[in-house]
């Protein structure tokens, strides 16, 4: 039986994922308000001008998914966000996405540790059979990171989404199936261990 995520905190050795709260936006803005973050297409490619604008733009979408604030366990610093959404219990499908990190943690164990916790929750706690991850076609850094997780590239959805700057995004879709999860989990654990 597949159940929806329950919105609880997910805690690992490297990161802690807490349900995104209204009080997190100041720290999220400080972590993510960098042109580097948005240049690859995060949040439609346009950085908000303030924490208040971020809150106003994000709140409607965040209310429709299980959004998390990513903190490092070592010092509790807010380093990003990631979410589970597009929940389809009948067809056992879920989408892991809406992920962005401060550039100082790019290439560290933060992303694999975050993905491990979210995938573990989706596959093991909730019983999903398919997890989708997608990114913009121009975001080659994210495509490489998703492929490194062990996800299968399924294809490109052309002219898929209008971005905040008015341009259209082509979207690259990847997936991981439940029977692939044990191998993906092993690879993630090895990456986190160094």
Residue ranges and their predicted role:
Residues 134, 152-165:
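Conserved catalytic-core motifs of GNAT/GCN5-like acyltransferases
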Residues 133-143:
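Conserved beta-strand-loop-alpha-helix junction that forms the acyl-donor binding cleft
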Residues 124-134:
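Conserved GNAT acetyl-CoA-binding A-motif
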Residues 1-110, 121-125, 167-194:
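GNAT-family acyltransferases
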Residues 142, 165-166:
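Short Asp/Glu-rich motifs
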């Amino acid at each position: 039986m597949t159940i929806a995520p329950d919105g609880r905190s997910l805690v690992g050795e490297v990161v802690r994922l807490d349900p995104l709260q209204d009080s997190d936006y100041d720290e999220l803005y400080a972590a993510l308000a960098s042109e580097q973050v948005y240049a690859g297409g995060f949040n439609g490619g346009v950085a908000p001008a303030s924490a208040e604008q971020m809150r106003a733009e994000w709140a409607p979408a965040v209310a429709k998914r299980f959004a998390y604030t990513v903190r490092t366990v070592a010092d509790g610093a807010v380093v990003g966000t990631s979410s589970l959404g597009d929940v389809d219990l009948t067809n056992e499908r879920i989408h892991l996405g809406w992920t962005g990190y401060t550039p100082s943690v790019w290439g560290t164990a933060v992303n694999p540790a975050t993905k491990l916790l979210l995938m573990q929750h989706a596959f093991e706690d909730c019983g999903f059979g398919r997890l989708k991850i997608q990114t913009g076609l121009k975001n080659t850094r994210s495509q490489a990171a998703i492929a490194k997780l062990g996800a299968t590239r399924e294809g490109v959805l052309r002219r898929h989404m209008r971005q905040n700057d008015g341009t259209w995004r082509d979207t690259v879709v990847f997936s991981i199936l439940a029977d692939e999860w044990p191998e993906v989990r092993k690879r993630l654990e090895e990456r986190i261990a160094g």
